[in-house]
Amino acid sequence: ILPTGDGMALVFFNSVHAAFKCAVDVGKKTYKHPQIGLRNGVYSGPVVPVKDINNNPNVSGSGINMAQRCMDAGDNDHILISNGVHQYVNQMDIPGLKFEDWGQVIVKHGSTVHMWTAYGPNFGRTEFPTWRGTKKAEFKSE
């Protein structure tokens, strides 16, 4: 667990399944408490442990950066995952688990990430993020 100012990052070095299950489990616990304002982004990529300028534990790498981009694309209660994560977790045995393909989402610096939203009866959401404007403006056409 790494503090990030007004949030935190949970880093899983060895299991994309564990990272995704954690996002779902936390989503279930906070689903009925919208005042918490939690968004989840899950991405699988290189992450290495480092020390920050104050010698505190931290991580670096595209994995943590892209997980942040996935999270930033959502509203409260979204569980947004990259296409690579979806390929690993789409058959997990989680009651009611469903996915919606959002395609190529434009993120920071104009780059794109193929994202899916994960949801179920008491976690996640499918609605397009209200703060991002229209779907057409934020998604790259295929």
Predicted regions and their residues:
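Catalytic core of nucleotidyl cyclases, primarily class III adenylyl/guanylyl cyclases
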Residues: 1-21, 25, 29-63
